[in-house]
Amino acid sequence: MPQDNEQYPPGLLGEGLELADFFISRVPDPLIILGQKYDFFDVRGFKEISEEVLYFYKLFNSEENFSFFIGTNPHGYYTDAQKEMVSFFCKIAKREIINLEPEIEIEKSENLFASKKRNVILEGSKPHYIILKENSEEIIKNRKKLNEEELKENIRKCLKILENIDVPHYRVLPFFSLKGKIIGRYAVETEENIWVILKKVNAEKPYFLEVEEEINLYIPDISSEDEIKRDNKFKEGKNYFIDVRGLGESMPVSKKFFFHPYGYDYMFDGLFILFGESYLGKRVYDVLSVLKLLNSKGCKRINLYGNCQGAIIGVFVSLFSDLIKSVSFKNLPESFYSLIEKPYVKLPSSNFPKGILKITDIPEILDVIGKRIEIKIS
């Protein structure tokens, strides 16, 4: 179901509210809801809302003040809905319906232009990315400098990450062979019914999760399997990969649709916003949970590698985990602010923590991390 960002009120579902509640607040005042059978917003939701609202109008003995209509068109405000609206208004106002099908005068195109030259930017308006840039600069200018503990506390709140993380349950999955390498697979339950996939390259005992004291852990951009295929020169030592929720093996669609403007990643991110959570924060939490498992299995030192989306996740993981010995980030954005300066970026919206610039930015986090571990960026 395509939705634009303004249709994701932060924390709405988390507070127990739903769309119907906004209409219920109008009871017993007159209200008509207009829908369409072939709308890409599923008509089942429209019917459910209408039935809930009608129930409350009945409680107030004002059933005559409520109506809902489902037309036979796709998304839009068509003639059938217009007629229904006018009829309802006239009923409430106790007015006679004079003409439901008036003659429509088609305006000339030039009379409908928003500006003389058909370009509002030429008339002095600012594009949205310039407004964002200016607002961000003001936020950054007034941002308080935080010490390491303050930084961790504020980012933890921003990403909604629990301070205490238990060792997660895991189960062994069937292994497979890739480019002559045996790949062990392990499903790690980071939350109830949320399974992320841990992979071990060249696993000698793939039916058993045996972890070395020092390992290399890779967080891929989209898919661990793709990066295993591409990388013929693994670092020395034992190499592990992790597919966090919504990436790799848990992607609900094929990779070619991942960056679709209204794709699943965008929708999942929006749902987390509605629940007052952070999709990126949950991915960071996934990795931190896996680190707890690896530590319980005897791992004491981790060399962390992150590519693009995985690098962003890795920045926050490195801040919170003492197991990390070194980090290597590939295709890591210079900063969140640098992405705001551009009119368009391909990076999915799920990688932008809401409100992060009020707290910090990537370079400041790297400065803190760099005081205790080695950082390489390419």
Regions found by a protein language model. Give the residues of each.
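Catalytic or ion-translocation cores adjacent to nucleophile or general acid/base/metal-coordination motifs
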Residues: 1-4, 331, 337-341
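Beta-propeller blade termini and top-face loops
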Residues: 1-8, 12, 53
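Alpha/beta-hydrolase-fold serine-hydrolase catalytic core, especially in secreted/extracellular enzymes
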Residues: 27, 34-216, 222-238, 245-297, ...
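The conserved SAM/SAH-binding core of class I Rossmann-like methyltransferase domains
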Residues: 242, 330
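Glycine-rich nucleophile elbow surrounding the catalytic serine of serine-hydrolase chemistry
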Residues: 306-318
